[in-house]
């Protein structure tokens, strides 16, 4: 979805006629309406509902209301979370701020995919009470600089064991116990659990 604001205005994308997509009515409402179980969810950044519909089949403009012309069919989606090893931490963890807690120095890890990792880092910054972003998905240069300053200082102090680059690496770091909490995708937590190792979010 993050590429849609560049692709659509360029005229490089034709709208898909949702009337021709048999299962369109079954697309999760988080994408089509920005709601889950009837409750509106956050729309910071390039929220799918902002870039899902076009005004017409050849439009270079998004529609704020649902139309029959869509930019994408959502196929894979995920949730970033803070994964923890409760057997090694031995106390509740309920805030992203714990990622930078010196109590676990050298046992933390964060995603090393900048477009996603910066969002996880911003959630930590907010949880620490350092700053509240008006829109984490559309940061100013100053907001990026602040976020990176906080994480660069944490890195220099030895807070992080690693910066994971792919799904398997995040699973292996957590399963081995090399890290006890990290930014993590929900399916990776399931993969750790499937090895009989406690892992929660």
Where is each model-derived feature located?
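Extracytoplasmic/periplasmic substrate-binding proteins
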Residues: 158-201
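Extracytoplasmic ligand-binding site segments that recognize negatively charged/polar headgroups
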Residues: 2-169
């Amino acid at each position: 979805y993050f590429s849609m604001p560049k692709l659509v205005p360029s005229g490089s994308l034709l709208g898909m006629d949702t009337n021709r997509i048999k299962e369109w009515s079954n697309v999760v409402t988080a994408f089509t309406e920005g709601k889950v179980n009837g409750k509106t969810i956050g729309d910071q950044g390039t929220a799918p509902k902002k870039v899902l519909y076009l005004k017409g089949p050849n439009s270079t403009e998004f529609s704020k209301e649902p139309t029959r012309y869509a930019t994408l069919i959502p196929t894979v989606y995920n949730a970033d979370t803070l994964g923890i090893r409760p057997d090694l931490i031995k106390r509740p963890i309920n805030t992203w701020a714990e990622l930078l807690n010196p109590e676990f120095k050298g046992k933390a890890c964060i995603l090393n995919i900048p477009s996603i990792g910066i969002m996880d880092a911003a959630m930590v910054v907010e949880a620490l009470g350092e700053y509240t972003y008006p829109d984490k998905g559309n940061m100013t240069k100053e907001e990026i600089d602040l976020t990176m300053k906080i994480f660069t200082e944490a890195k220099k102090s030895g807070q992080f064991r690693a910066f994971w680059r792919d799904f398997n690496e995040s699973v292996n770091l957590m399963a081995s116990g090399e890290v006890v909490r990290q930014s993590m995708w929900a399916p990776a937590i399931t993969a750790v659990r499937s090895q009989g190792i406690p892992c929660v979010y």
